[in-house]
């Protein structure tokens, strides 16, 4: 455990006593340093290590602590005024800073400080919360939301109105993760630490949380919390044991590899299911 991690862990145990007036300079400096590192992509709340996703809980704790050490203040983006504890990521950016960052942020895109946006990303009018990581080449389409500490991979498309759940409210153990080369269809919601593995296609209007049954049509298996790599998923229903009613589920209708996905458009994958 590094000294800064130990300091964060200790502060989190005392979080009920920490306020903007009582926080020590050392603790405040440590929290600010961690948020700056997350903002710059030097630290991630979750990362894949040896093929498995690992959540760095101490970083999530630092994000939570950051709300304890600041009072609300007036924020002004030139269009409107706001009252919050977290600055916007672009508050003091000039043209040179945007050019160096290498991504596009159109009017209406709101990104909180303490989230990372990689190069070649496009942010339509959308919201990216503190602690989130958005990797290269990703499109965050209009009215999509990337929740606190969510991890979005390379070349992902989050379609209009998509919701990627956060971990802070309500408090979740692990962040929601969308791996590389995934397509999330319009108005879908992926929440509660669900992992959508690489190359998956989620159709429009699919809702997946930890309690959502994920039914594989080919095998008949039911799983929870993880969409296997290369899955094509639509919304559906499964009957009750007595057949008197049915309940919502997500249905894996087929599996595709990267080669097939590269040759076939998203719409084609979702037709003829």
Swiss-Prot record:
> Which GO terms of the molecular function aspect are on file?
2,3,4,5-tetrahydropyridine-2,6-dicarboxylate N-succinyltransferase activity; nucleotidyltransferase activity
Q: Which NCBIfam families match?
A: dapD, PRK11830.1
- Name of the protein described by the UniProt record: 2,3,4,5-tetrahydropyridine-2,6-dicarboxylate N-succinyltransferase
Q: Which residues does the annotation say bind substrate?
A: 104, 141
Q: Gene3D superfamilies annotated for this entry? A: Hexapeptide repeat proteins (2.160.10.10), Tetrahydrodipicolinate-N-succinyltransferase, N-terminal domain (1.10.166.10)
Q: How does it assemble?
A: Homotrimer.
Q: Name one Pfam family in it.
A: Hexapep_2
What is the name of the gene encoding this protein? dapD
Q: Give the enzyme class.
A: transferase
Keyword check for Repeat: yes
What are the TM regions of this chain, as residue ranges?
Answer: none
What EC number(s) does the entry state? 2.3.1.117
**A single cellular component GO annotation:** cytoplasm
What InterPro entries would the database entry show? DapD_Trfase_Hexpep_rpt_fam (IPR005664), Hexapep (IPR001451), Hexapep_transf_CS (IPR018357), THP_succinylTrfase_dom1 (IPR023180), THP_succinylTrfase_N_sf (IPR037133), Trimer_LpxA-like_sf (IPR011004)
Reaction equations catalysed: (S)-2,3,4,5-tetrahydrodipicolinate + succinyl-CoA + H2O = (S)-2-succinylamino-6-oxoheptanedioate + CoA
Give the pathway listed in the UniProt entry for this protein: Amino-acid biosynthesis; L-lysine biosynthesis via DAP pathway; LL-2,6-diaminopimelate from (S)-tetrahydrodipicolinate (succinylase route): step 1/3
Q: What is its main location?
A: cytoplasm
In which compartments does the protein localize?
Cytoplasm
Q: Which organism is it from?
A: Laribacter hongkongensis (strain HLHK9)
Biological process per Gene Ontology, one example term:
diaminopimelate biosynthetic process
What SUPFAM superfamilies does the entry give? Answer: Trimeric LpxA-like enzymes
Recorded family membership: Belongs to the transferase hexapeptide repeat family.
């Amino acid at each position: 455990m590094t000294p800064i991690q130990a300091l964060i862990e200790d502060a989190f145990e005392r979080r009920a006593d920490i306020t903007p007036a009582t926080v020590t300079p050392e603790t405040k400096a440590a929290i600010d340093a961690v948020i700056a590192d997350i903002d710059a992509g030097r630290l991630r709340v979750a990362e894949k290590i040896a093929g498995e996703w690992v959540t760095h809980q101490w970083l999530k704790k630092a994000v939570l602590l950051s709300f304890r050490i600041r009072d609300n203040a007036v924020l002004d983006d030139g269009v409107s005024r706001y009252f919050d504890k977290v600055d916007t990521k672009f508050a003091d950016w000039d043209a040179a800073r945007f050019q160096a960052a290498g991504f596009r942020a159109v009017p209406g895109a709101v990104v909180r400080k303490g989230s990372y946006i990689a190069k070649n990303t496009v942010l339509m009018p959308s919201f990216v919360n503190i602690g989130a990581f958005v990797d290269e080449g990703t499109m965050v389409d209009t009215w999509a939301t990337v929740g606190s500490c969510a991890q979005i991979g390379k070349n992902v498309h989050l379609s209009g109105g998509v919701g990627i759940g956060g971990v802070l409210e309500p408090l979740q153990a692990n962040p929601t993760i969308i791996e590389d080369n995934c397509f999330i269809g319009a108005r879908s919601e992926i929440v509660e630490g669900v992992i959508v593995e690489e190359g998956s296609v989620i159709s429009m209007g699919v809702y997946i949380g930890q309690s959502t049954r994920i039914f594989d049509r080919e095998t008949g298996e039911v799983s929870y919390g993880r969409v296997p790599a290369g899955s094509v998923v639509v919304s559906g229903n499964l009957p009750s044991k007595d057949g008197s009613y049915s309940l919502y589920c997500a249905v894996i209708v087929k599996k595709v590899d990267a080669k097939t996905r590269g040759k076939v458009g998203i719409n084609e994958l979702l037709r003829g299911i």
